[in-house]
Structures are given as C-alpha cells and as structure tokens.
Amino acid sequence: MTKRLNRRSFIKTAAIAGAGLALIPNKAFAGNKKPIPTEGKVRIAFIGVGLRGRNHVSNISKNPDVEIVAFGDISADAVAEAQKIIKADGRAKAEEFTLGPTDYLRLLKKPNIDGVVISTPWEWHARMAVDTMKAGKYAGLEVSAATTLEQCWDLVNTYEATGVPCMILENVCYGRQELAMLNMVKKGVFGEVVHARCGYLHDLRGIKFNNGVEYGTKSFSEAQWRTNFSEKMNADVYPTHGLGPISLALDINRGNRFLSISSAATKSRGLHEYIVEHPKGGENHPNADVNWNLGDVVTSTIKTSRGETIIVTHDTNVPRPYSLGFKLQGTNGLIEFDGLESGGIKQPDGSYLNTDRIYIEGKTEPHEWESAAKWFKEYDHPLWAKFEAEAKNTGHGGIDFFVDKEFVDSIKEKREPELDVYDAAAWSAVTPLSEMSIQEGGEPQFFPDFTRGKWMDRKAVDIK
C-alpha cells in the first residue's frame, strides 16, 4: 500500500478564495466575431501553480507566441517552482502574487494580461473565472468548472454580460482515440448514434490520503481539499473527462442538449477499508470514524433532446485500473475502449494485449469483435497527424498540448474557444444534479438550458 502512495502525482496545492470585481463589459468579444489576429505575443497569467498548474506552465512556456507575465498562488514555494520552469526555457521572471488568498484580484487588475489559466481547487474555479471575465481577460478553467447550479449560471451570465470567453480545459476532448471516435461519428461509421457510456474510473485512494491516511489540514496537495468532497457529497463529483468527448460526439449544446439525469450510488466502503488496513491507519485511527458520504460507485443516466442515452460512472474509492469506460453505439455498430490509449491487459512477457474493440455491421465479421486499432489509425484526426511531434513530450500522452494550444490560439485570434462556457456549465451541472437525484431516490432531475435556446442553432464543434 505504501508503494501506491508514492507513485501518485499530486496537483493543485492550495485553495485560493475570491471576491467579486466590478463588471467590465468587453463588447469586442460579444457574439461570434471572425478571427482577427492580435499583434505581438499573447500575454498569459496563471492562478494556481501546483503540479497541475505547473503542467500548463510547462506546455505554454514552449509556445513562442506567448509571454508569461504573472503567477498567483498562496504558496510561494509553488510559484518558485513555476519560475524555474520558465527560466529553463529562457524566459524572464514572471510577476508574483503570493500575499494571500485574495491576491489574485490584484493580478487581475494588471493591464498586460490577455488570458488567465486557473488551476485551483474545484470550489474556487467558478468564482475565479467570473472575476477573470469581469476583468476583461480570457478565462481558461480547469475541470470541473463548477460544483453548484448557481456557479454554472454565474459562469454563463458573466460571459453573456461581458462577452469575454471562458474555456473549460477538458484535455480528454483532445485525446487521439477520442478525436478518432469523433471523426468516425462525423463520417457516419456508426450510423445514427443512439447510446453512449463514459466515466471516470480511477483508484484515487493514494491521492485522497497522504502522510499515511491523512486528509485536510494534516495533509498536502489534493488531499487537502479533494477528499472533503468524498466526505460531504454523494454525487458524480468529477464528470467531465468522460462526458466531454461524448458531448462533442452527440453535438451537446449544438443541435442537441442534456434533458434529464437519474443517478444512484452504491454504499461507501472503500475509503474506510483503506484507512483501517493501511500500515499508518487502523481501527483506532481518528479517520476510521469518518462517515464517508460518497458512494464507491455512482451511476447516472442522462437523456438528451435527440433521444440518446448516456451512462456516466464515477468510481474512485475502490481498487481498479484506470479507465474512462467509453462506449458509443449507433444503428451500424459500436466501439468500446478505455480511453487515453490504455495499454490493455499485461501479458507474461511484459507486452500488452490491446482490448479496444469495434463492431460495424457489414464491415467486420458478423457477431464478432474486431480490434479497434486499425480503425483508430484510419480515422486518426488531422490535428494529431499535424502536431504529434510537438505533443508527444507534454502531459497525459500529449493531450495537454492541444488543450493549451487551443486556449492560446483562441485568444490570439480573438474568437470563441472550441470548448466554451456553455460546455463548462452543462458538463459540470452533472455534479449538483446527480446529488439531487441520489437524495431523491433516483428521481430524474432536469438540466437547465444554459444556452437559453441557442443550442438549436449553434453549429457543431469543428476541432482543427
């Protein structure tokens, strides 16, 4: 068990609280303007430079079109690490904002900032993005974008009042397999899509606890804040990694929308057992008495306006390998894969047996699965073919390169990002709505129409 603790990556080291700024309308961004290249470099600041934030720093620092101007974090040590990254890339030292939890507001007042990447704990995401948009700066917001319906509406309302874009930085939308799946959908491989499945299935016990089995104030990194959600909420608290790519495939907010969600949760056993069985835990450890609210597996069924269903699973408290559990099914066939180019099943010789599979009527052998490998290759997205060499050494198998590139490009071209504020609101709304559904015994909860009817006329995302 100790080995599991040591092999995890920890991110988002500090919570940064926020307060509102005066509303600063920016009509230059209102509506869907044609791309207008900016003069000079795109000036980027970062709020939150823990491990996740520093991953963004590392990626964006390699972009020659960018000037990195500021870091904000309550941890001076985290900022010092971020400074080392840009110094190694030959960049000048960025201005630092480390005077306390509201010092990011001083950062946002700086006139020499075009966009802000926000990588802080979930509960601060929405308020910081709202303040960023009010300051007239593009907001690049880590996932999930919001934890309440009120926060979802705050994001949308602020965008519509200011015209300043907000991009949800959902990196899995740029996964090679995920984009190949999207390509297959666009080219009609599956026929008319009727059903999908996705989720976040990831053993996070070694992230939710450290220093043995500590969390909160006695721990560090994500365990300081993420574990609190397992104690306080019974919901799908992290839906966007799986739901983002599926939403693009189903044209959510662009000709289709989520209508309702019905959710159920299992009992909670995994975190308690982890504590009592850990060498530094035990039955007498104070945390053995914690009443964990989050069910070990949360399952939600979403219905869409076009008649598809989506099953979304959250599974982070019990032992398991990583998976995003993708399935997409249409009138011609279906595909199933774990996502992020999972290695598959490890063989005795150390190699891996790929388990990605596809069935297309009339194209594959009747009633038999076929490896999806050649299909992924045939429908490889042009984005990957063009930028594979640049992406290969960046985070999460290259997908972080693409999400950061899109954020910077959208600022440079003065356009809406491919993943916008309506996506941020709709995908993140799964958390509060699933919580309400579980509390009401699985009763369906209805999604607000965050687009206020615009989903009927908005065009499908054209990732390029």
Feature annotation, model-predicted:
Residues 142-144, 170:
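Short beta->alpha connector loops at strand-helix junctions that form conserved
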Residues 300-306, 330:
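Active-site beta-strand termini and strand-to-loop segments that position acidic
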